[in-house]
């Protein structure tokens, strides 16, 4: 459920384009106008504004925003402009080929998207960057972490609600054996189950594992795996159980302690604002006894703060 508020009566794309053009004129730009328009338009409306702006002014709106805005606000607005699949592809490209590989962002995008979304992302990635997503993962990831990502990308998973209890129990026993023996060959068993099974099935396996062995499957994974391999398996498991809690926890981590992980904060707020942010907000308040709105307000400043808070909606 989306949180950003769209006006009851939305101006036409031409009116919005005119207002943006005026906001860019003169020394500097009127950032408030840019935020008031773009933070309160959905993806379809933003695309129409872009088309109208280019048609009327023979200018690329995103390039204009890139030249006029600065800092974290610029990053947030530019990430907000594309439709979801294009945005995800660009996040993956930057995460894979940036100065530092952002393994957590890669796992977040790949392991929280549906099979149909992943197929679209792969197509857009290839069309936009002239290289397959799998090829960049081959180049930048390694070991079991790479194997999980590639398997998750290329496996067709059932996405319905039905489960087979016998298969669930068998997977619980197989996972117990895989994490108990610590044989290298058992890693492939973990990869196969975590990347091949539906989210509903994995939730049932997690519950059955707890009932059969008196231990959380997540703890077993943490005890017996390490590094990026551990992180991507836990991401798959946590998102199968409750993806909104996964995002709430990631937001909390981005703002906890000294400093702010603005890259993660921007990525999650922007990518979830039109999807399930209302449920993430509810999870955040329930788990941390503080509203996400107040947390973001405390960790950001100026127009950057205004833009993110506009995407979050009212303080609830």
Swiss-Prot record:
Tissue: Expressed mainly in roots and flowers. Lower in stems and leaves.
Keyword ATP-binding: no
Binding site for Ca(2+) 3: 300
InterPro entries (UniProt xref): Annexin, Annexin_repeat, Annexin_repeat_CS, Annexin_sf
Keyword terms, alphabetized: Acetylation, Annexin, Calcium, Calcium/phospholipid-binding, Metal-binding, Phosphoprotein, Repeat
Gene3D superfamilies for the chain: Annexin
UniProt entry tagged with the keyword Lipid metabolism: no
Induction, per UniProt: Up-regulated by cold, heat shock, dehydration and salt stresses.
GO BP of this protein: pollen development; pollen germination; pollen tube growth; response to cold; response to heat; response to red or far red light; response to salt stress; response to water deprivation
Modified residues (N-acetylalanine): 2
Residue(s) carrying Phosphothreonine: 112
Pfam families per the UniProt record, alphabetical: Annexin (PF00191)
List of residues binding Ca(2+) 2: 259, 299
Record-listed Ca(2+) 1 binding positions: 24, 26, 28, 68
An example Gene Ontology molecular-function term: calcium-dependent phospholipid binding
Modified residues (Phosphoserine): 95
Residues carrying Phosphotyrosine: 284
Ranges of the Annexin repeats in the UniProt entry: 11-82, 83-154, 166-238, 242-313
Family statement: Belongs to the annexin (TC 1.A.31.1) family.
Record remark: domains: A pair of annexin repeats may form one binding site for calcium and phospholipid.
Protein name: Annexin D5
Organism: Arabidopsis thaliana
